[in-house]
C-alpha cells in the first residue's frame, strides 16, 4: 500500500513539473517571433542611397524604389 502511495506521489510531481515546462515554452516562441518582427522592421527603416536612383541592393525593400530616402 505504501508503494502505491509513493508511486502516485512521484507521478503527481512529474506531471506538475511537465506542466510547468510546457507553460514556459510558448512564451519563448512568442518572444522569438516578436524579435524577428522587430529586426525586420529595423531593416525596412534602413536608409536608402538616393531618392532619384534605385536603392542599394543590400536590402530587398530598397531594391525597387525609395520613399523619401527610406524603404517604401
From Swiss-Prot:
Residues 1-19 form the signal peptide. It is found in: Secreted. Coiled coil: none annotated. Residues 20-44 form a propeptide. Disulfide bonds join 48-62, 55-66, 61-71. GO terms for cellular component: extracellular region. Pfam families: Conotoxin. It comes from the Eukaryota. One of its GO terms (molecular function) is ion channel inhibitor activity. InterPro entries: Conotoxin (IPR004214). Expressed by the venom duct. Keywords: Cleavage on pair of basic residues, Disulfide bond, Ion channel impairing toxin, Knottin, Secreted, Signal, Toxin. Its main location: secreted. The keyword Metal-binding does not apply. Belongs to the conotoxin O2 superfamily. The presence of a 'disulfide through disulfide knot' structurally defines this protein as a knottin. The cysteine framework is VI/VII (C-C-CC-C-C). Inhibits voltage-gated ion channels. This is Conotoxin Vc6.16. It comes from Conus victoriae.
